């Protein structure tokens, strides 16, 4: 999902802006001056992170852009180090997933259940860290990015780089389920608290 697609769901986007601390208006689905002001603050923080940590490949940039600016900083800091490490290992690394709206999450949840296909998630809309602009997943590829490695011992190697970033959790430290490609900003102690806060706006 791109940031443009997220913005089309105006109420969801307003909640994202409010969660980031920029939007002080009502969640009404109407783009007004308060939302415009919040979007400017979002873009300013986004630009600052790019200046500090640099920019990357198109796919990673597309997914980073969907995260809260504070999470974008984490993603950029981690990816800068991860790309250097991946290169030494003879691989390429990219961020392949960022924020999902509740609607997109529900569609993924339906796959392998009410819709054809293999199951890809156990979380409905509002029950995934990806629904709040806080989490991203990365993928490991061949140097030319023509081959994707869904399984590799290097997920652990690269994922561990996130452990040293303050207020960050790497899914490889989880017990059930272990999620080595997953990294998130620790804004809330549980996904329940994240959902409750997000929905309360």
Predicted features and spans:
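Second-shell loop/turn segments in exported
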Residues: 1-4, 24-27, 63-74, 144-152
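Surface-exposed patches in mature extracellular/periplasmic domains of secreted proteins
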Residues: 26-27, 90-99, 168-177
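Short, surface-exposed loop/helix-turn segments at secondary-structure junctions
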Residues: 108-122
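Generic non-transmembrane alpha-helical segments
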Residues: 16, 20, 78-89, 157-168
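Catalytic cores and adjacent binding grooves of peptidoglycan-active enzymes
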Residues: 119, 123-201
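Active-site acidic/histidine clusters and adjacent loop/turn architecture
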Residues: 56-97
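Acidic helix-start/capping segments at beta-turn-to-alpha-helix junctions
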Residues: 30-34, 95-108
């Amino acid at each position: 999902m791109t940031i443009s697609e997220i913005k089309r769901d105006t109420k969801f986007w307003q909640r994202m802006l409010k969660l980031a601390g920029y939007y002080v208006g009502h969640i009404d689905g109407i783009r007004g001056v308060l939302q415009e002001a919040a979007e400017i603050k979002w873009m300013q923080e986004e630009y600052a992170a790019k200046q500090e940590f640099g920019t990357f490949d198109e796919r990673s940039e597309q997914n980073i852009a969907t995260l809260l600016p504070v999470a974008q900083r984490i993603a950029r800091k981690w990816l800068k180090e991860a790309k250097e490490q991946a290169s030494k290992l003879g691989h390429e690394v990219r961020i392949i997933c960022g924020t999902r709206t509740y609607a997109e999450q529900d569609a993924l949840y339906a796959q392998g259940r009410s819709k054809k296909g293999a199951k890809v998630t156990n979380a409905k809309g509002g029950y995934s860290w990806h629904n709040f602009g806080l989490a991203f997943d990365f993928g490991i590829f061949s140097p030319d990015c023509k081959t994707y490695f869904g399984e590799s011992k290097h997920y652990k190697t690269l994922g561990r780089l996130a452990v040293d970033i303050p207020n960050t959790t790497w899914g490889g430290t989880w017990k059930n389920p272990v999620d080595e490609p997953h990294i998130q900003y620790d804004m809330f102690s549980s996904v329940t608290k994240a959902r409750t806060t997000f929905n309360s706006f």
